[in-house]
Each structure stands twice: as C-alpha cells, then as structure tokens.
Amino acid sequence: MIFITGTDTGIGKTYVSSILAENLKKMGINVGYLKPVETGGREDTLTLKNILNTDDDLDLMNPINLKLPLSPNIAFDVENSPLTLDEIKEKIKNAYETLKEKYDFLIVEGAGGVCVPIKEDFLMSDLIKFLGLDAVVVSRPNLGTINHTLLTVEHLRNKGINVRGVIINCITDLSEVLYYEKTFETIEKVGNIEIIGIVKSREDFEIDFEKILR
C-alpha cells in the first residue's frame, strides 16, 4: 500500500498513479485505487476506474466528493456539508479497509499538496498518518522544485511519515530544463531522499517498482 502525494496541485499525481496502476496490473498484481477526497467532480477517480477496469463503486473509490474545485476545507464550508471531521475520517477508513481486503496492493492518492486542509486543521499529511501509510512524492523538474520537494519531504518526516522516494513527473520536457541532473542530485543529497522514478511520458518512464511495492 502506498500514498501518492505531491508538491502541489496539478503536479501529476493522478497521471503517475495511473502509470503505476497500469503497469502493476500488467505485472499480474491485483491492484486497487482509492481517492479519499476529490473536489471538482470525479475526474481522477474515473480515470483510474477506467484504467483498472474495475467494478468498484465510485463511492467506495472516492468516499468524500465535493462539487467545487476548491481546497477541501473551503469546499466543505461553501457547500454547507453537514459531515463532521470524525464522520469524514470514518468514511475514508471504511473505504480503505474494504479495498485493502480486496486487493493485494492499493494506491491511495491525495488531493493537492501535503498541507492542504481537509476539514478544520486536519491536513492531507494527517490523513496519510491516520491511514498508517508510507508516501511517495510526485514532483516536477522545473526551477523551484528543489525548495518545493525538500519542504514537502521535511513536512512528511516531521509528521512521522516514511517517504519512500520522489517521482519526477516531467510536465516540462527535460530538454528545456537547464542542468536538471544537478537539480535531481541536489534533491537527493540535501533531502537525503532517493528519486525512484522519472516519468517523461506514459510510454517513456523509469520507475523502481520494488520501492513502490516493498
């Protein structure tokens, strides 16, 4: 089981999750997907449902769904949701336990970055801790990624969460990124964290699946 988080929203968590799911399935692994919280519809959940060709109910794969494309805590307020934090945690936990029993491996994908509030002061990182999962951080190769990646890893570690590694999602072609190798070296050295994957496209990627599955 693994929790896929990222340095920001729109960083490619769903894209990377879909590549992981697709290839783990090709390896013969019975893999499932959980998106505990999704705002702005169910596009991410539907993407993985189609890739995995699963009959899992959408309400199971995505127990907390909010209509507006906002931070979950703001969407809860604006939509006047009656759900309490305890009820939210219970719904997510029940979905997680159900899927965990059904599958050999479960990909759990967050929403936004690690510090986005879900409800009140309960952050996405608190959800990772609540579920007792290790994390993989999806990052980008562009200028600024050193700061964003190291801050994300440090925050997770300060919460007592084990970070298995970083996957670089090339939202910008590497040929357009100056000295990206040195950027990656800096992340690994300063953050004492391994880059376990580089995704250039759905067909062109290098991922250490052993680190994902361990």
Curated annotation (Swiss-Prot):
<feature type="binding site">
    <location>
        <position position="39"/>
    </location>
    <ligand>
        <name>substrate</name>
    </ligand>
</feature>
<keyword id="KW-0067">ATP-binding</keyword>
<keyword id="KW-0547">Nucleotide-binding</keyword>
<keyword id="KW-0479">Metal-binding</keyword>
<feature type="binding site">
    <location>
        <position position="44"/>
    </location>
    <ligand>
        <name>Mg(2+)</name>
    </ligand>
</feature>
<dbReference type="GO" id="GO:0004141">
    <property type="term" value="F:dethiobiotin synthase activity"/>
</dbReference>
<feature type="binding site">
    <location>
        <position position="44"/>
    </location>
    <ligand>
        <name>ATP</name>
    </ligand>
</feature>
<dbReference type="GO" id="GO:0000287">
    <property type="term" value="F:magnesium ion binding"/>
</dbReference>
<dbReference type="GO" id="GO:0005829">
    <property type="term" value="C:cytosol"/>
</dbReference>
<feature type="binding site">
    <location>
        <begin position="109"/>
        <end position="112"/>
    </location>
    <ligand>
        <name>ATP</name>
    </ligand>
</feature>
<keyword id="KW-0093">Biotin biosynthesis</keyword>
<dbReference type="InterPro" id="IPR027417">
    <property type="entry name" value="P-loop_NTPase"/>
</dbReference>
<feature type="binding site">
    <location>
        <begin position="10"/>
        <end position="15"/>
    </location>
    <ligand>
        <name>ATP</name>
    </ligand>
</feature>
<protein>
    <recommendedName>
        <fullName>ATP-dependent dethiobiotin synthetase BioD</fullName>
        <ecNumber>6.3.3.3</ecNumber>
    </recommendedName>
</protein>
<dbReference type="Pfam" id="PF13500">
    <property type="entry name" value="AAA_26"/>
</dbReference>
<keyword id="KW-0436">Ligase</keyword>
<dbReference type="GO" id="GO:0009102">
    <property type="term" value="P:biotin biosynthetic process"/>
</dbReference>
<feature type="active site">
    <location>
        <position position="35"/>
    </location>
</feature>
<dbReference type="InterPro" id="IPR004472">
    <property type="entry name" value="DTB_synth_BioD"/>
</dbReference>
<feature type="binding site">
    <location>
        <position position="14"/>
    </location>
    <ligand>
        <name>Mg(2+)</name>
    </ligand>
</feature>
<comment type="subunit">
    <text>Homodimer.</text>
</comment>
<keyword id="KW-0460">Magnesium</keyword>
<comment type="similarity">
    <text>Belongs to the dethiobiotin synthetase family.</text>
</comment>
<feature type="binding site">
    <location>
        <begin position="169"/>
        <end position="170"/>
    </location>
    <ligand>
        <name>ATP</name>
    </ligand>
</feature>
<keyword id="KW-0963">Cytoplasm</keyword>
<comment type="function">
    <text>Catalyzes a mechanistically unusual reaction, the ATP-dependent insertion of CO2 between the N7 and N8 nitrogen atoms of 7,8-diaminopelargonic acid (DAPA, also called 7,8-diammoniononanoate) to form a ureido ring.</text>
</comment>
<feature type="binding site">
    <location>
        <position position="109"/>
    </location>
    <ligand>
        <name>Mg(2+)</name>
    </ligand>
</feature>
<dbReference type="GO" id="GO:0005524">
    <property type="term" value="F:ATP binding"/>
</dbReference>
<comment type="pathway">
    <text>Cofactor biosynthesis; biotin biosynthesis; biotin from 7,8-diaminononanoate: step 1/2.</text>
</comment>
